[in-house]
């Protein structure tokens, strides 16, 4: 008796430990796991970071550039020998105007950045939607399997009853066969639903990267899709909602605006550019070089550049 109680206690503890290792995972945690695990979300995020860098690069054109260069020059002359000079040059350049090229490039980068953000949110929504759909499919197939099992238990009890009735001569053998056919049909349905459940479980594990059991997924019975869905009857209101919330539409608009700014930048490049340039040169002559021939100098000027021909690049 003591040995029997020991085995029962051990089995109960083992079962409790196993149950504690398989907690029910909320839908929110499954969605977060999928957003972390799916490569498409990561790729979309890094594309957003790239577009942010492109925007910073476009904005950097608004700032002046400061350069420091050093060079060693050798000049051999027959009369005086070899002249050497170490030249240190600091130059400051600032583009005063380019007639809208930089502004158009910045606006283009902003539209592309907004596009990447919208695509990132769209990717997360797609992944979340797939997780939610799979989540409720798993719950649905579990309930269908449970219903089939309950019905099978009912027919099995009926089969036992008919066995007694046939033995006593009250019922016929054909009645028992009908019950057995019903049980076989339920077994077939159970196998089919189990296969569907396995497919959905594999899909959930592939999306989340988690090793899950069907018992860990239980839907909220209070969830009602049609109570939360907003039915829109007005075509104008529906179109307004599409223009405001639809990711594909917003991306299409931003792509068109970015292309327009690209065209504006190409048209503006037909105009000249005006730059303010300042430089300071420090010379350090040596050898047979004279200091008077290599004096330090400071220059300030305005450069106007106009492109005459670049192989039809702007028109292309």
Q: How should these model regions be labeled?
A:
Residues 4-13:
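Sec-dependent N-terminal signal peptides
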Residues 126-241:
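Periplasmic alpha-helical coiled-coil/stalk elements that build and connect Gram-negative outer-membrane
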Residues 43, 48-50, 55-57, 106-108, ...:
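Heptad-repeat amphipathic alpha-helical coiled-coil interaction surface used
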Residues 32-42, 49-64, 90-108, 118-125, ...:
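A glycine-/polar-enriched beta->alpha junction
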